[in-house]
Amino acid sequence: MSDVTVRQLAGIVGIPLDRLLHQLGDAGLQISDADDVLSDAEKMKLLNHLRQSHGKVQESVTEPKRVTLQRRSVTELKQGTVPGKGAKTISVEVRKKRTYVKRSELPETSDRLSEAEQARRALEEQQQRELAEQEARRQQEEMLREQAAEEERRRQEEAARTAEERRRRDEEERQAAAERETVAAKPAPVAAPPIPRPAPEPRPPARPSAGKPKAEAPRAHPAERETEARGDKRSAGLSRKDEYRELQGDDFRKGGGKRKKPKTGRPMLMPEQKHGFEKPTAPIVYEVAVPESITVSDLAQRMSVKGVEVIKALMKMGVMATINQVLDQETAILVVEEMGHKAIAQKEDDLEAEIMANLAAEAEAPQLPRPPVVTIMGHVDHGKTSLLDYIRKSRVAAGEAGGITQHIGAYQVKTDHGSITFLDTPGHAAFTAMRARGAKVTDIVVLVVAADDGVMPQTREAVEHSRAAGVPLVVAMNKMDKADADPDRVKQELVGLNVVPEEWGGDVQFVPVSAKTGAGIDTLLDAILVQAEVLELKAPVAIPAAGVVLESKLEKGRGPVADILIQRGTLKKGDFLLCGKEIGRVRAMFNENGKPLKEAGPSAPIEVLGLSGAPEAGDEFIVVADERKAREIALHREEKLRSTKLAAQQAAKLEDVFSLMGSEETIDLNLVIKADVQGSLEALRSALTELSTDKVKVRVIGGGVGGISETDANLALASNAILIGFNVRADGSARKLIEERGIDLHYYSVIYNAIDEVKKSINGMLEPEFKEQIIGIAQVREVFRSSKFGTVAGCLVVEGHVRRNLPIRVLRDNVVIFEGQLESLRRFKDDVNEVKSGMECGIAVRNYNDVREGDQIEVFEKVQVAPH
């Protein structure tokens, strides 16, 4: 320790300078100036002085030299209480303090203790004993006062009871005398004089016993106490009859102890049987929260009435409804007000707005640069996946069925220029919704156009999606290695869509590339990063994560799996996710290569396990801290979806009713679709439903993500539906049921194969269409009679030819008078099958004999035509 001045020591210790100087003087140090230097020896002397003054003497041995014990003894004092009750026990506590000193230190300690200390301890012990005695006396006096008060109360009750009995006996005597006067014919028995009941002598109070407290005697049972009381009454001179008279009061009548009928002149005193609770007269008015759609039963439950009452109110308003029918918000509010309650229009997103407000507050965290999210769009087979394949140096396209992309693939690529997140969307017409989702979550759209093919329908659609989302475009002219590649043609066609290249004065970068040779790939990546720098992409990192679901599926052994893209914040393992109507805790996270992760930041595409179900593709997800609120929101969203479906079903039923009026009956083709991912299911459902015609309606009655289960097979069996498995297979129990019941099951891995098969099924369900085709006309020249055929017409074939066993029509003056079958066809005397134009023949018409000269016989046949 170095030497310091007094002023410095005061600053180190944290005490005033004057106080430190005073303490130095008390320690015997001749220091008066604040700038004097203190040595280590002087500081130790000051420290020893302070310890002695505060009673802290430095000891070399940590072993205690004395032990102080506080002894507490409890004694019990038994105190008698009122008669009939057990004795009361009082606890008396005596506290003693003893100090034990080591024998080796005893002489020194005894010398150290002064006489004043010993006197103080003796005084404390005496005071404790006096306090204990005073407490015991106080408790005893209080107990005696309670006993005296209890005895006085019992005496007063006994006196009041005796006076009441005397008054009751006097009243009975007066009634008996009145009865004797009214009944003069019968000798009235003389009433016995009342027997006075001596008052019981009060018992002397029990003296408190100073012995050990005994266990309290068990209290008498109520029935035993009642029996003892009756015994006391009988011992006092009351008979059972007197007791009965006492109990019955005015209703007791003489004459064998039987009751007589009450006289009409004297009113009977009946006990009041009115209930104590009275129903409130004012009506109860509830505040009813009315959502956008609610069923009649739920509305009745919120108003605490029966559903029938709500239906009656609706009928008065002119609305016919059932208990399960869905009402809109306006109708429900009118019903609530009609029934006298207060309606409150409930907003659907109250809880969600609260959570979003919290997210908005958290979004004020500092923002850091993030990788760009790039979506690759273009027409089918223009080389989108192959281009991404070359960038990632892997065979992505080989894993897709038919070499086409059927759901969004998300990959993060680390290049020499930085990280880029790529989204590969399908280019088929059936995947329009998936391309629209890809445009919403992206920062830059790379439009891939084949230089040898030019602009195609899905190319125009991709331009519209990017323009609607306000996302900048980078055009990649692919397949430049082909001989017939024409980049100028691509530029001209895109200029027609208002996509102008930079070299022509526009703002869109056009990059010629080849996914096969890799030419222009680095230039394309540079163009993407330049565009990202212009956009200045940033996102907060140190907040809970939020983003969007790209795809979801149901995997065996892993459960619901969601492919998500984080847009802001950091997602950690164990976070609680709210994703559409699904919730769950993140059990595991994986990147696009299957590597497990503990956390992921913005623009990272990851795979998440742990949700309660497979969410819809395009749903937004957020990390919430309040698990209860998240469950409420998920339940509310599910209820809203169910209400929407019910309302749509109700509307569909009404539409079906009106469409059936005046129209032919339609045929339903029911389908049950199971797919590997949510996006493919959505695309299949949309594409197959659009195949409906006026005569055949395609209905998807069930669908989901995952393998075909026994439940799906039972649904298809019950609804006579076709089972379609898209990149999934049926499990063992489902296969057994499908084979036993002969359910129509089809597996597909390319969406267009499924569409073609359903088209064939629709054509097979249509009724065959037939067209009448006139093949010949014969002119009747003469009529003959035949014993075998009846009337036979001699005819000349003027048009076409006539064949045997075909339907015919007989025309007279170009009016059909008969339609039947050609029975016999002869030429001269020979039966022939066919007679050509310009030749004569004999025709016999089955079941018709009114053929005349000049008639025409028209021969026709029905030809089946393909339905359209």
Curated annotation (Swiss-Prot):
Region (G2): 403-407
Compositionally skewed regions (Pro residues) per UniProt: 190-207
Cellular component aspect of the GO annotation: cytosol
Localization: Cytoplasm
Skewed-composition ranges (Basic and acidic residues): 103-183, 213-254
Stretches the record annotates as Disordered: 103-274
Stretches the record annotates as G3: 424-427
Region (G1) residue spans: 378-385
InterPro entries: DNA-bd_dom_put_sf, EF-G-like_DII, EFTu-like_2, IF2_assoc_dom_bac, IF2_II, IF2_N, P-loop_NTPase, Small_GTP-bd
Region (G5): 514-516
Chain intervals with Basic residues compositional bias: 255-264
GO molecular function, one term: GTP binding
PROSITE patterns: G_TR_2 (PS51722), IF2 (PS01176)
Sequence segments annotated as region (G4): 478-481
Keywords: Cytoplasm, GTP-binding, Initiation factor, Nucleotide-binding, Protein biosynthesis
Presence of keyword GTP-binding: yes
UniProt domain tr-type G: residue ranges: 369-538
Residues holding GTP: 378-385, 424-428, 478-481
Function: One of the essential components for the initiation of protein synthesis. Protects formylmethionyl-tRNA from spontaneous hydrolysis and promotes its binding to the 30S ribosomal subunits. Also involved in the hydrolysis of GTP during the formation of the 70S ribosomal complex.
Family per similarity comment: Belongs to the TRAFAC class translation factor GTPase superfamily. Classic translation factor GTPase family. IF-2 subfamily.
Protein name as catalogued: Translation initiation factor IF-2
